[in-house]
Swiss-Prot record:
This is Receptor-like protein 44. Keywords: Cell membrane, Glycoprotein, Leucine-rich repeat, Membrane, Receptor, Repeat, Signal, Transmembrane, Transmembrane helix. The keyword Transmembrane helix applies. It holds the Pfam family LRRNT_2. The keyword tRNA processing does not apply. Residues 245-274 are cytoplasmic. The chain crosses the membrane at residues 224-244. InterPro entries: Leu-rich_rpt, LRR_dom_sf, LRR_N_plant-typ, RLP_Defense_Trigger. The lineage of its organism: Eukaryota, Viridiplantae, Streptophyta, Embryophyta, Tracheophyta. SUPFAM superfamilies: L domain-like. Belongs to the RLP family. One of its GO terms (cellular component) is plasma membrane. It is found in: Cell membrane. Residues 1-24 form the signal peptide.
Length: 274
C-alpha cells in the first residue's frame, strides 16, 4: 500500500469518527423529538428544544439541551422538573435506550405511564410525582431491573399495585402515596426486613382503597393511641371530679367546724358563773 493510500484511509477514518461525534444517535433523536411533541410548554421553558438540537444534542459529556445530561455522546439523564409542563409522556421515550434517570416531577402532565418504559433497561431512577397521571401502574416497570427509585406520589393513579414490582431487588425508594390505588399491598413490597417493613406506611398513605401491612399496623397504632387518649381523658376527668369533690368536702367541714366553735362560744357566754 502506497503512502498516499494510507493517508487517504487515515483521512477517511478521521472523517467517519468526526461524523459519529457530531451526529446524534437516531434513537435519541426520535426519543427527544417525540417527547417534545407530546409536551405542552406554556412557560416556554423548552424553547431551545428544537429539531436542529435534536440532531446533535450531545458532544461527549456536553449537552446542548437544557434538562438533559450526556454520557459519551448519549442522553443518559432527563430532568424536567417543575416547569409547568402539560401534555402526556410519549411512548417513544423508550428510544433513549441509555437513559438512567427520568425526572418529570412537579408538572401538570396527564395520561398514562406508557408500558414502553420497559425498554429503558438501564433506568435506575423514575420520578413522575406531583402530576395528573391516571390509569394503572404498568407492571412492565418490573422489567427495568436496575430501578432504585420509583416515585409516583400525588397523581391520580388507580387500580392495584403490580405484584411484579416487589421483585425489583435494587428498589430502595418507593412512593405511591396520595393516589386512587386499591387492593392489597403486594407482599414483597411490604415484607419485613428484620423488625422493619421494606417500605413504611408513608409510601402508601392517601389511597382509600389500599389495605394490608404496613398500613394496617399504622391504623392499629393510631386506634390504640385514640383509645389511650380517651382513657386518659376519662381518667383525667375522673381525677378532676374527685379533686373538686374533695375540695368541696374540705370547705364544708371547715365551715361546719367554724359554726360549731361559734355556737359553743355563745353557749359558754350565756352560762352563769359559779
Amino acid at each position: 500500500m502506497t503512502r498516499s493510500h494510507r493517508l487517504l484511509l487515515l483521512l477517511l477514518l478521521i472523517f467517519q469518527t468526526a461524523q459519529r461525534l457530531t451526529t446524534a444517535d437516531p434513537n435519541d433523536e426520535a426519543c427527544l423529538k417525540n417527547l417534545r411533541q407530546n409536551l405542552e410548554d406554556p412557560a416556554s421553558n423548552l424553547r431551545n428544544w428544537t429539531n436542529s438540537v435534536f440532531s446533535n444534542p450531545c458532544s461527549g459529556f456536553t449537552s446542548y439541551l437544557p434538562g438533559a445530561t450526556c454520557n459519551n455522546g448519549r442522553i443518559y439523564k432527563l430532568s424536567l422538573t417543575n416547569l409547568s409542563l402539560r401534555g402526556s409522556i410519549s411512548p417513544f421515550l423508550s428510544n433513549c435506550t441509555n437513559l438512567q434517570s427520568l425526572d418529570l416531577s412537579s408538572n401538570q402532565i396527564s395520561g398514562v405511564i406508557p408500558p414502553e418504559i420497559q425498554y429503558l433497561v438501564n433506568l435506575a431512577v423514575l420520578n413522575l410525582s406531583s402530576n395528573h397521571l391516571s390509569g394503572e401502574i404498568t407492571p412492565q416497570l418490573a422489567l427495568c431491573a436496575y430501578l432504585n427509585v420509583i416515585d409516583l406520589h400525588d397523581n391520580e393513579l388507580s387500580g392495584q399495585i403490580p405484584q411484579q414490582l416487589g421483585l425489583l431487588a435494587r428498589l430502595s425508594a418507593f412512593d405511591v402515596s396520595n393516589n386512587k390505588l386499591s387492593g392489597q399491598i403486594p407482599t414483597y413490597l411490604s415484607n419485613r426486613t428484620g423488625n422493619f417493613p421494606r417500605f413504611n406506611a408513608s409510601s402508601f398513605i392517601g389511597n382509600k382503597g389500599l389495605y394490608g401491612y404496613p398500613l394496617q399496623e399504622m391504623m392499629m397504632k393510631s386506634k390504640g393511641l385514640s383509645v389511650m387518649a380517651i382513657v386518659g381523658i376519662g381518667l383525667g376527668s375522673g381525677i378532676a371530679s374527685l379533686m373538686i369533690s374533695f375540695t368541696g368536702v374540705c370547705l364544708w367541714l371547715r365551715i361546719t367546724e367554724k359554726k360549731i366553735v361559734e355556737e359553743e362560744g355563745k353557749i359558754s357566754q350565756s352560762m352563769p358563773d359559779y
